[in-house]
């Protein structure tokens, strides 16, 4: 069978299903892929058990089960992630193994919002999932229209509580199971849901269109030419002649001009996100720049030392700690290319954190580093990873 050609003319977005256990996330995922395949003949119709039997993957030493499903609407191509267990969601969202441009929150109309509904909304907020669309599932089991309205209001209030625009979020009522069984009325609801997703979740800005940033991996000097910083361009583009800022691990940011861009020993006019390059920097001494700093477009990213984060602590089985840790614990925080020591403060009422738990915490680093909300990091102890986290708010 010939491989289907990937249609680049359509925009692409990464989404996922979130919500409480047994509210119908996987059934909905199967229903979306099936209904869209039936409508356009494109993509693959996935059955529930194909999605539910997701293989385990290891992402930075953390074991996660995730199902990856792809499908397309008339205007967009989607990569959709669905996780079998609650712990998999927590790990997935915190490590960024599954980056989501938006999420479909599945709430059973028969049960209303439950503890994990709340937890997934909070996680979405903390890890920076920007948009949520709601699917009220199992509506075929609820006869009372008023009850449906009540559940919808509850979900909207819950979203508002975590700073999502609860009043404006699209809410679609349906039944994933009925749609999967081929009931035309409920298939229509799936199309209505995807129309809402198409419209409400904006096409993400591509990495190449964002402002330039490159973490410095290595530095060396070329006699007669100057200092070269090497690394992989994380986002944006850099051209010969561009002014860049060197950020982190120093009192003041310094500016310099890129006088040459090299890749695979060849000279380039410019480099973009994904390229592994060497950037020749004007007037920068070998000791003025080091691994762990970043080069960035001036004024686009700032150095910080204190932030709030959402963290997953590896279990003993994943190679993590065997014992809990407490406030004032001082591990290394590995940002992009380097370790920086930091002190942890746990939230009020949290005595300690056990291996396998996830928690919010405040971190204070001993030196500043270029960070933003959404920056990912690992927590390490003597070179082994004991946790994975994401910056949720910067405090100073």
Curated annotation (Swiss-Prot):
InterPro entries in UniProt: EF-Tu_GTP-bd, EF-Tu_GTPase, EFTu-like_2, EFTU_2, G_TR_CS, P-loop_NTPase, Small_GTP-bd, T_Tr_GTP-bd_dom
Binding site for Mg(2+): 26
EC number of the protein: 3.6.5.3
Catalytically driven reaction(s): GTP + H2O = GDP + phosphate + H(+)
Region G1, residue ranges: 19-26
Residue segments, region G4: 137-140
Residue ranges occupied by any tr-type G domain in the UniProt entry: 10-205
Molecular function terms, GO-annotated: GTP binding; GTPase activity; translation elongation factor activity
Covalent S-S links between cysteines: none
Compartments, as annotated in UniProt: Cytoplasm
Domain of life the protein comes from: Bacteria
Region (G2): 61-65
Function, as annotated: GTP hydrolase that promotes the GTP-dependent binding of aminoacyl-tRNA to the A-site of ribosomes during protein biosynthesis.
Family affiliation: Belongs to the TRAFAC class translation factor GTPase superfamily. Classic translation factor GTPase family. EF-Tu/EF-1A subfamily.
Protein name: Elongation factor Tu
Natural source organism: Bacillus velezensis (strain DSM 23117 / BGSC 10A6 / LMG 26770 / FZB42) (Bacillus amyloliquefaciens subsp. plantarum)
């Amino acid at each position: 069978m010939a491989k289907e050609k990937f249609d680049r003319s359509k925009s692409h977005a990464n989404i996922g299903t979130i919500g409480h256990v047994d509210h119908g996330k996987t059934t909905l995922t199967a229903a979306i892929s099936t209904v869209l395949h039936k409508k356009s003949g494109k993509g693959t119709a996935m059955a529930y058990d194909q999605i539910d039997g997701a293989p385990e993957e290891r992402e930075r030493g953390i074991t996660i089960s995730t199902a990856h499903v792809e499908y397309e609407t008339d205007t967009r191509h989607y990569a959709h992630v669905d996780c079998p267990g609650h712990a998999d969601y927590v790990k997935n969202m915190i490590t960024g193994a599954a980056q989501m441009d938006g999420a479909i929150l599945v709430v059973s109309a028969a049960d209303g919002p439950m503890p994990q509904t709340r937890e997934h909304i909070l996680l979405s907020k903390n890890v920076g999932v920007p948009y949520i669309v709601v699917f009220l599932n199992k509506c075929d089991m609820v006869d009372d229209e008023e009850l449906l309205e009540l559940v919808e209001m509850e979900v909207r209030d819950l979203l508002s509580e975590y700073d999502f625009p609860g009043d404006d979020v699209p809410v679609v009522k349906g039944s994933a199971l009925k749609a999967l069984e081929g009931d035309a009325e409920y298939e229509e609801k799936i199309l209505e849901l995807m129309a809402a997703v198409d419209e409400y979740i904006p096409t993400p800005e591509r990495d190449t269109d964002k402002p330039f940033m490159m973490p410095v991996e290595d530095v060396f000097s070329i006699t007669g030419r100057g200092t070269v910083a090497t690394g992989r361009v994380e986002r944006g583009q850099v051209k010969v002649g561009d002014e860049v800022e060197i950020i982190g691990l120093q009192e003041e940011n310094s500016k310099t001009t890129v006088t040459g861009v090299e890749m695979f020993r060849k000279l380039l006019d410019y480099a973009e996100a994904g390229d592994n390059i060497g950037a020749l920097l004007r007037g920068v001494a070998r000791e003025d720049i080091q691994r762990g700093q970043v080069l960035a477009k001036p004024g686009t990213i700032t150095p910080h030392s204190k932030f709030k984060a959402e963290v997953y602590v590896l279990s003993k089985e994943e190679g993590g700690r065997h014992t809990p840790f407490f406030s004032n614990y001082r591990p290394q925080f590995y940002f992009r290319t380097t370790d920086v020591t930091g002190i942890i403060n746990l939230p009020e009422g949290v005595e300690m954190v056990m291996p396998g738990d996830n928690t919010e915490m405040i971190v204070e680093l001993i030196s500043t580093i270029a960070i933003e909300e959404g920056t990912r990091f690992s927590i390490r102890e003597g070179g082994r990873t004991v946790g994975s986290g994401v910056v949720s708010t910067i405090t100073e």
